Amino acid sequence: MQTASSAPRKGALTRALSAPGTANGLILLGAVLQVLFFILYLINGDVHVDEAMLVLNARSLAREGTDIFGQRMPVYFDTWLYGGQSSLATYLAAVFIRLFGNQIWIARLPLALTAFASLFALKGLTRLLFPGQYTVQNTVLLLSIIEPWRLYQSAWTLDCAYLPFVLLFALYFLVHAVEKPKARLLFYTLSMACFALGLYAYMAAAILIPVLLVILYLSLLIKKKMKFRYALWSVAVLAVCALPFLLLGLVQAGLLKDCNFLGLSITAMDSYARGNSTTIFGAAGSAGAVFQRAFSNLGGVLYNILVPDLMLLQSARYPTLSGNVSNYPFGHTVAGLLALAGLLLFLWPKKHRKATTDFAKTTTARVVIGSFLGAFLVYAIVVSYASNAMYRYAAFYPLLHILAAFGVCWLLVSFSSPAVPRLLAGLAVVSLALTGFAFGNFSTHNSALYGKSFEQALTAARDSGSSEILLVDSQDPYFRERESVFLRFYADDKIDQMTPLEPELRARGGLSAGNPDVAPRLRPVTKDGSWRYVQVEENRDLTDDCYIFFGTVPQLDKTRQQEYAVKNYNDFCVTLVRKK
């Protein structure tokens, strides 16, 4: 009887994938790819507004011990007032900035290092789940190191991107505790500590992690792979490590007043609305409407997984989408079909399954995969689907890699033609090429989510020598709040001279949507008023020396064309400087 790892060898790729030592070479390749994309993004990339806000908080923590709103050591960051930001990502960036300096690449290093380290966790996890099945192990690792989302998120910091990497460590420690008797209590403890860290990595983990752990632990207990005392110990450790997060939940629910815990501030986020806007719990109306939304959520996610290049193809047609986080899925080309094939192989009744295509041989492997599938179904139904927010499901990408690896191994086992491994190698190369293509589009984008155009406009205004810089008020509240953040991010040398960010966001940001009163928005940026927001509706309103337009290109009459030098950046930001 043959296994996937002992199947007849059909060429260099098959031999390499079935070799035990290949994993180390794949990890080295993963490191090289991450470094290359990290450097490429520094050269050709940009700064996402969420990253800019994270760095603002990290800088403030490194300097003052408070976030950008003046709150000392918060458990979670009330960053946008209506939506929070990961404390794990922010505190790690703050530590690196404090130790190594205030540069964007330094703020990005913690996530890049975490992503790389997670490859070792993945290697250990696959060896525990698929012992002796080196083809499966190495294929999972290969699919992970060329994963578009991993390469993209290793290059810059989207705060929620820590969750998938933290979960890999949590699962490795947990499976090690289940499978190996040595130091079992220690590994259960490490596992629960990592699961707790996941709660501080992404607010949606408050749904994902409890659901996953309930299914996983019940399955392990039913299958007699875990003793009940270890389950109790795990609950206790998780509760202790997650206590600040749990206290935040009680404060947010109004069951507890604002408090401090071990030096951490736990305060209610009064305007927080993500729970309603990004989950099914915010669905209003009848039970039928809720059911329809649940079906839409699940259907949208499954379709996007089956056709993972959906956003990339849209970006190729509409360059304004370039840089969209969801351009970078769990895999390119036929990854969705391979994952579907792997799922069918996993679900196929055991009595009808061939030994050569039974890749999840151990009870623990089947429990882990099955638990993740169950958690995915619940999560995909509850969390609101949006094609441009597939990063919400990145925690399940390792599951998709495992299923896709089953599909790859099935092809290698079932077809003796040497064309099969060559085709698979070609698809891996195409995947990297497509990811590189998407990266290359950053130089052409014009989006309010990214700051390069605004940085250029602000630099031109500051270099003009004008004593005042007037920022033209936008009609879009989300453009306005992003401009407020980018101003403080790119003009860090003037941050002490600027007015507080919180009242500015309340007056100009998303919370001001629908308010027709313009006056509160026309406020000073600097304390001396030399930088301020103004309203420009007609050409005759242009009376000063220097203006910045964010998200719009002004139409100047002949008189103003002669009067002002126009500097246009990607048809998105414009600086007007009066000619000398």
Where are these regions (language model features)?
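Hydrophobic/aromatic-rich transmembrane helices and adjacent perimembrane loops
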Residues: 153-154, 207, 333-338, 366-415
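Signature aromatic-anchored transmembrane alpha helix within multi-pass, membrane-resident enzymes
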Residues: 193, 214, 239, 408-439
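Transmembrane-helix motifs of polytopic, lipid-linked glycan transferases
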Residues: 109-131, 169, 173, 341-347
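Transmembrane-lumen/periplasm boundary regions of multi-pass, lipid-linked membrane glycan transferases
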Residues: 54-60, 64, 209-341
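Membrane-interface alpha helices of multi-pass inner-membrane proteins
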Residues: 141, 186-203, 240
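Extracytosolic helix-loop segments that constitute the early lumenal/periplasmic catalytic or substrate-binding loops
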Residues: 37, 53-91, 95, 270-281
